[in-house]
């Protein structure tokens, strides 16, 4: 049976030297006394550039493989969701959803402007801000009217 003894805070002082395992020694390791061959700096730089280029190519390939199928599906998903909303609620539901989305967008823009007060733009400074919104509403109304006629 082992005997109970006090342990020091430093574990190395507690364990006798003959009980400490020695690190394994490899037979073919070069000693520090052997001269290290000179490494050509240009070889390292060229090799590093090739590795970086190869890693960039691998990253681009992974990006294309993983992201492309999802990006291709987005327009189809948007049309499908619009069709489902139209079939469930009709044109009024689409307009209600559009108005709710635009209201949420306006509230989000307002909250960001409150957080960054230096970025405020008064309406008379840029009258062209209204044009894209009017164009978007006009296109959506035209598309809904086209769907109603079919």
Swiss-Prot record:
Motif residue range(s): BH3: 51-65
Positions of the record's site feature: Cleavage: 143-144
PTM info: Proteolytically cleaved by RHBDL4/RHBDD1. RHBDL4/RHBDD1-induced cleavage is a necessary step prior its degradation by the proteosome-dependent mechanism. Ubiquitinated by the ECS(ASB11) complex in response to endoplasmic reticulum stress, leading to substrate recognition by the segregase p97/VCP and degradation by the proteasome.
Transmembrane segments: 127-147
Transmembrane is among the record's keywords: yes
Stretches of the chain forming a coiled coil according to its record: none
Membrane topology: Single-pass membrane protein
Domain of life: Eukaryota
Any Pfam family hit: bcl-2I13
InterPro entries with a match to the protein in the record: Bcl2-int_killer
GO biological process, one term: male gonad development
Main location: membrane
Subunit-level organization: Interacts with RHBDL4/RHBDD1. Interacts with BCL2L10/BCL-B.
Role: Accelerates programmed cell death. Binding to the apoptosis repressors Bcl-X(L), BHRF1 or Bcl-2 suppresses this death-promoting activity.
Entry's free-text remark on domains: Intact BH3 motif is required by BIK, BID, BAK, BAD and BAX for their pro-apoptotic activity and for their interaction with anti-apoptotic members of the Bcl-2 family.
Protein name per its UniProtKB record: Bcl-2-interacting killer
Organism: Mus musculus (Mouse)
């Amino acid at each position: 049976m082992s005997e109970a003894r006090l342990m020091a805070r430093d574990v190395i002082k507690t364990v006798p030297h003959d009980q400490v395992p020695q690190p394994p020694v490899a037979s073919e390791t070069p000693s520090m006394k052997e001269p290290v061959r000179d490494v050509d700096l240009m070889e390292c730089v060229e090799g590093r550039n090739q590795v970086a280029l190869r890693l960039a190519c691998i990253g681009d390939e992974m990006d294309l493989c993983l992201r492309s199928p999802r990006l291709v599906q987005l327009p189809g998903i948007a049309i499908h969701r619009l069709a489902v909303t139209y079939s469930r609620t009709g044109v009024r539901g689409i307009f209600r959803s559009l108005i709710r989305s635009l209201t949420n967008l306006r509230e989000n823009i307002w909250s960001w402007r409150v957080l960054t007060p230096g970025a405020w733009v008064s309406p008379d400074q840029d009258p062209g801000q209204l044009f894209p919104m009017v164009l978007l509403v006009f296109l959506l109304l035209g598309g809904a009217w086209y769907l109603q006629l079919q």
